[in-house]
Amino acid sequence: ANESLDADFLMTPNVQSLPDVKVEAKAPVRAKLREFEERRIAGAGGRFLTQADFDKRAWSSTADVLRSSLPGLEIKRDAGRPSQAYAVGGRMQVPGGTLAMAPPTGAPPPCFAAVVLDGAFVYQGHSGEPLFDINSLNPSVIAGIEYYSSAGSIPARYNGTRGTCGLMIIWTR
């Protein structure tokens, strides 16, 4: 019962063609923009501009893009330096479209929106603090902007104990 058997087998490939598959997916969100995208998708109380909004108006100043895209956000230009622009928050007290300010001594009594750039405050709204010129950023470097007009809508991470005139969060590419 100890017999062995030798056998040769000829194997030929039997290839089956499958139909083409098309895979579509959104590009992964960069870690830097994750919280922006989470709040934007959730509709978390703010108004949002994406990179596509800025790409469509790359020839404009950042202030002009904001002025035309975020109704209710007041943009003020410095009368002495008209290329500079600042976001005025909900309790705006400045008439007209320009400010008369002493050279960079800081914010006068009107209520300017606080500004966060890539997660760090660059203007917090303290008296005498230098304002942040939103035109210092070209639209081509902006990945997204969030604007919150009232303290109740500001994300907890950025809502300190100070009174607020709104918050603008700017994300760069």
What residues fall within each predicted segment?
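Periplasmic plug
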Residues: 86-151
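Soluble periplasmic/extracytoplasmic beta-strand elements of cell-envelope proteins
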Residues: 6-10, 20-24, 48-49, 65, ...
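A beta-strand signature from Gram-negative outer-membrane beta-barrel systems
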Residues: 9, 137-173
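Short, glycine-/polar-rich solvent-exposed loops and beta-turns at beta-strand/coil boundaries
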Residues: 1-3, 75-87, 138, 158-164
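Residues that line or immediately flank small-molecule/substrate-binding pockets and catalytic motifs
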Residues: 25, 61, 77, 129, ...
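Amphipathic, non-transmembrane alpha-helical segments in extracytoplasmic/periplasmic proteins
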Residues: 59-70
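Short, acidic, small-residue-rich periplasmic hinge/interaction motif at the N-terminus
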Residues: 2-55
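Short beta-strands and strand-coil junctions in structured, solvent-facing domains, enriched
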Residues: 16, 29-31, 56, 72-76, ...
